[in-house]
């Protein structure tokens, strides 16, 4: 029989378990790439597609979070997914699972970009008009002013 006390055996068990868990955590930390490293390892076509659709995915995630908040505030069971069609129910399997219409999203984004460009052009026009007005404004004592 073993003459070692019970606490010693349990201490060994906890130490061994801690070593196993610590090894797993360290392996996870040092082998998992960061988001930047992962994106950098993509091929140029996939990276371009990722960057192009980044805003769309963020908007879709925001829409999903709004649906989750609405669903959590209701008294219905968790498995009722609200406006999202459940793939587990027969009558909802063929429903569109997209939360946001991609074409509408791109159209709205293009309109916002166009509006920004128009605002920027108007600001530049005002600045040019202000500079032109200052150039026209000449003083009689200034021999270098153009009249």
From Swiss-Prot:
It holds the Pfam family CBP4. Signal peptide: none annotated. This is Assembly factor CBP4. It comes from the Eukaryota. It is found in: Mitochondrion inner membrane. GO terms for biological process: mitochondrial respiratory chain complex III assembly. The chain crosses the membrane at residues 13-32. The gene is CBP4. It is a single-pass membrane protein. Keywords: Chaperone, Coiled coil, Membrane, Mitochondrion, Mitochondrion inner membrane, Transmembrane, Transmembrane helix. Belongs to the CBP4 family. Residues 88-139 form a coiled coil. Essential for the assembly of ubiquinol-cytochrome c reductase. It has a direct effect on the correct occurrence of the Rieske protein, core 4, core 5 and apocytochrome b. One of its GO terms (cellular component) is mitochondrial inner membrane.
